[in-house]
């Protein structure tokens, strides 16, 4: 039955930002084909692609395959192109889509065209209609053919002629245009599905990688599910070294990780590693998709997680990869490691002047095929087969000189030598009969066990060969490699170039069969990187700024990185793999009991007594009788109870619903379950300003302290008191073992306050620190007691002296600050 509808998809190949985007491959189809498939779901009498004359030959082929007609017209005057097409089409309703939107909500298109036609029944009239609130790139426009043809004769505005729809909706004095809020099913205005840039294209690839290629277009729900997936939200880009002289191991490691997931691998056009293309082609045969190899990095509109495997980052590379969610580096040996949010060391290194977050040799893919222990022998005659392998490149040209010497030392052995692609394999080698030169050995790791001796340099092959049970001799190519060979007990050739004597010495070394300090448990690097993609990068909670130079690294551990802000001096968690904590009933019962041996409520009276001590400190600064005291993070109310007993008026807030219910229903104090600083205190309590505001072990839980401290200032009367407690970054635990202090620091503590820096930070927010109280004194944490050969009694003189020392020099592991508001906070 005739519907009086025509679908027109607008398309050109001359886009300046991303040329030929409509014919880029997306899964097994071009971007344009995704659009055409979606628009075929919208019932119509005819389906067109409106393109320009230059694009027509390429576009027409795609149209024929997808049951669309192709029309060519003006390149620049798109309105004229549409009108020229519509002049010869019998239809009333036009459904317009564009060819750079592969993830159209076709269900929304159907609903919108039906709504348009409903509004044109009888004497009603609508000239233009579109749904608002859809993802950018998932909507269509519906308009009247008659209205558009008329509007085109009435406007000379360049914008109207370039974009079609504005010819109607920019002239609402003449045309009825309806912008209708979309139904909730389609209303996701913050999402972006269009392809206008290369970064958009990478996002589209991620969507297809998640949803998988299929003949039918994706439903609205499939597209939305993809946007919530890790693939799309947290794109991972692996950046291997493809520089001549760095070998091929970095590239192999990244490609191997990418093939098991849907990570992108960045291979720049200006690569100098000659073997790169052939290696990548090998991985295509193993299942790597061509779309996973990218030639430019995404921008901030599709912020990637960058994982570098570059040997040594350069300043140029740091600038190139500067746009990222966070930066992870593998075996990084440069002076730029402070730029790295997370460091993973896999191959044992020598004397690096920094600690990684993780050192784990189990990420080395060890061979499954291993020599029988009985096959190991140390006589010259027992060495039947030798492999000489200096990586995919051999930049120093060691292969031929080494083979020359090896043949003299092991005259009856068969020698296989891997030569780089740049070397001539047809070389007329003098000795000939026992030597075979090959360009590469497929799946070398699983064939190493076939060799009695492997001669290589320090790197993955050395560890793999040792694990496979081969004898290993290293030829150090640098002083660093010689030091590494010594440190990790490899036999190595001591002379700069191999000689018969130096090879024999290495062969007779006790380290010919090395005993390596590596974890034989095999772990998947791709799985680990996938886990890392869930992590979050955190800026300084005070300044909230990303500086050109990275903040100084204080400590790294397997789940977190800590830095010191170069602007304000705050120590803060800058990277975390931990999930955000949810403060429910369990936090105050099971979790609290695990840490302190009793539940929070069982500890109520003890905490309340601490409250009285704190109140006395507050009283030294101001009177509190009949004054309003607001406790942020009040929990089950022990401090509120102490405030009430001290004849002040308590108010509380906490994000734990059970705790707030207890305070209201059992203690009968005003409290609300509202996050700070979002709370509106006037609405909640009818109070515009408080006399005292407190936070007891709460302030360290905020990721944005700037907004918190501004809100405290705004909620506090002039000369009011702000008091808070927090772990101290200058206590004995932090001073005696900094890395352990940060390791055992709770994973939801985002800032670490230090008394020496707190005054300047708080002054910025209008507070004067009047009193600092060092608390949490633990003599048992001092090395002189902790490391003592015998147990030290709490009653002993040594214990008492250490305790006095701790208090005298403010070495408590917690600290309390008592501040007075001196001025309003500056904007």
Regions flagged by a language model, labelled:
Residues 53-117, 292-299, 312-313:
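Short phosphate-binding loop-to-helix
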Residues 61, 104-193, 199-210, 224-229:
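Conserved core of the sugar-phosphate nucleotidyltransferase
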Residues 214, 219-221, 340-397:
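A nucleotide-sugar donor-handling region in carbohydrate enzymes
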Residues 249-253, 375-423:
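Conserved catalytic-core segment of nucleotide-activated headgroup transferases in glycan assembly
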Residues 534-688, 692-696, 706-709, 774, ...:
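Conserved N-terminal segment of class I S-adenosyl-L-methionine
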Residues 551, 771-827:
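A C-terminal cap/extension of S-adenosyl-L-methionine-dependent methyltransferases
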């Amino acid at each position: 039955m005739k519907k009086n509808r025509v679908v027109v998809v607008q398309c050109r190949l001359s886009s300046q930002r991303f040329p030929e985007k409509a014919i880029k491959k997306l899964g097994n189809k071009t971007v344009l084909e995704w659009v055409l498939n979606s628009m075929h779901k919208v019932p119509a009498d005819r389906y067109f692609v409106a393109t320009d004359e230059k694009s027509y030959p390429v576009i027409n082929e795609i149209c024929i395959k997808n049951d669309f007609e192709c029309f060519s017209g003006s390149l620049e005057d798109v309105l004229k192109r549409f009108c020229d097409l519509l002049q010869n089409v019998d239809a009333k309703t036009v459904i317009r889509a564009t060819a750079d939107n592969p993830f159209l909500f076709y269900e929304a298109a159907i609903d919108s065209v039906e709504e348009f036609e409903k509004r044109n029944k009888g004497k009603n009239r609508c000239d233009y209609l579109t749904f608002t609130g859809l993802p950018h790139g998932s909507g269509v426009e519906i308009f009247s053919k008659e209205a558009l043809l008329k509007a085109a004769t009435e406007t000379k505005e360049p914008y109207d002629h370039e974009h079609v729809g504005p010819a109607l909706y920019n002239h609402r004095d003449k045309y009825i245009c309806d912008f209708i809020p979309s139904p909730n099913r389609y209303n996701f205005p913050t999402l972006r599905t269009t392809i206008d840039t290369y970064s958009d294209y990478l996002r589209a690839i991620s969507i297809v990688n998640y949803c998988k290629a299929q003949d039918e277009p994706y439903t609205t729900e499939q597209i939305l599910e993809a946007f919530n997936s890790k693939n799309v939200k947290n794109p991972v880009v692996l950046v291997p070294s493809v520089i001549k002289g760095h070998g091929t191991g970095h590239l192999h490691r990244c490609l191997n990780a990418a093939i098991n997931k849907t990570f992108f691998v960045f291979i720049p056009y200006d690569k100098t590693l000659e073997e790169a293309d052939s290696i990548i082609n090998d991985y295509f045969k193993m299942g790597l998709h061509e779309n996973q190899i990218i030639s430019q990095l995404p921008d901030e509109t599709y912020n990637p997680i960058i994982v570098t495997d570059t040997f040594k980052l350069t300043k140029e590379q740091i600038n190139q990869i500067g746009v990222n969610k966070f930066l992870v580096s593998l075996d990084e040996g440069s002076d730029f490691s402070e730029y790295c949010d997370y460091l993973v060391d896999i191959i044992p290194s020598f004397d690096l002047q920094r600690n990684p977050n993780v050192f784990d040799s189990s990420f080395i893919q060890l061979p499954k095929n291993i020599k029988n222990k009985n096959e190991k022998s140390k006589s010259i005659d027992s060495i039947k087969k030798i492999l000489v392998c200096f990586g995919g490149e051999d930049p120093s040209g060691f292969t031929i000189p080494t083979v020359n010497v090896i043949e003299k030392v092991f005259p009856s052995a068969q020698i296989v030598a891997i030569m780089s692609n740049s070397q001539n394999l047809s070389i007329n080698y003098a000795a000939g009969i026992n030597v075979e030169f090959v360009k590469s050995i497929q799946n070398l790791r699983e064939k190493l066990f076939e060799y009695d001796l492997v001669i290589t340099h320090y790197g993955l092959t050395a560890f793999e060969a040792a694990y496979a049970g081969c004898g290993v001799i290293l030829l150090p190519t640098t002083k660093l490699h010689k030091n590494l060979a010594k440190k990790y007990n490899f036999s190595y050739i001591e002379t700069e170039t191999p000689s018969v004597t130096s090879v024999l010495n290495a062969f007779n070394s006790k380290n010919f069969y090395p005993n390596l300090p590596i974890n034989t448990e095999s772990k998947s690097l791709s799985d680990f990187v996938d886990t890392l993609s869930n992590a979050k990068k955190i800026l300084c909670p005070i300044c909230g700024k990303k500086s050109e130079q990275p903040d100084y690294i204080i400590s790294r551990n397997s789940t977190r990185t800590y830095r010191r802000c170069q602007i304000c001096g705050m120590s803060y968690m800058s990277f975390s793999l931990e999930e955000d904590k949810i403060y429910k009933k369990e936090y105050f019962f099971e979790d609290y009991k695990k840490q302190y041996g009793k539940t929070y409520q069982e500890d109520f009276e003890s905490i309340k007594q601490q409250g009285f001590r704190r109140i006395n400190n507050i009283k030294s600064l101001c009177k509190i009788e009949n004054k309003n005291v607001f406790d942020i993070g009040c929990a089950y109310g022990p401090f509120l109870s102490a405030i009430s007993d001290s004849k002040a008026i308590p108010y509380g807030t906490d994000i734990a619903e059970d705790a707030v219910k207890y305070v209201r229903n059992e203690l009968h104090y005003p409290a609300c379950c509202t996050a700070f600083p979002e709370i509106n205190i006037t609405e909640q309590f009818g109070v515009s300003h408080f006399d005292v505001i407190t936070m007891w072990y709460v302030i360290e839980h905020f990721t944005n302290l700037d907004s918190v401290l501004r809100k405290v200032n705004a909620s506090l009367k002039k000369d009011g008191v702000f008091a808070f407690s927090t772990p101290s970054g200058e206590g004995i635990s932090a001073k005696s073992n900094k890395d352990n202090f940060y390791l055992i620091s709770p994973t939801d503590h985002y800032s670490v306050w230090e008394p020496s820096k707190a005054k300047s930070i708080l002054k910025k927010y209008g507070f004067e620190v009047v009193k600092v109280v060092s608390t949490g004194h633990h003599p048992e944490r001092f090395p002189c007691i902790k490391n003592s050969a015998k147990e030290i009694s709490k009653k002993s003189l040594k214990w008492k002296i250490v305790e006095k020392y701790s208090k005298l020099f403010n070495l408590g592991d917690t600290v309390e600050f008592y501040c007075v508001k001196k001025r309003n906070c500056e904007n």
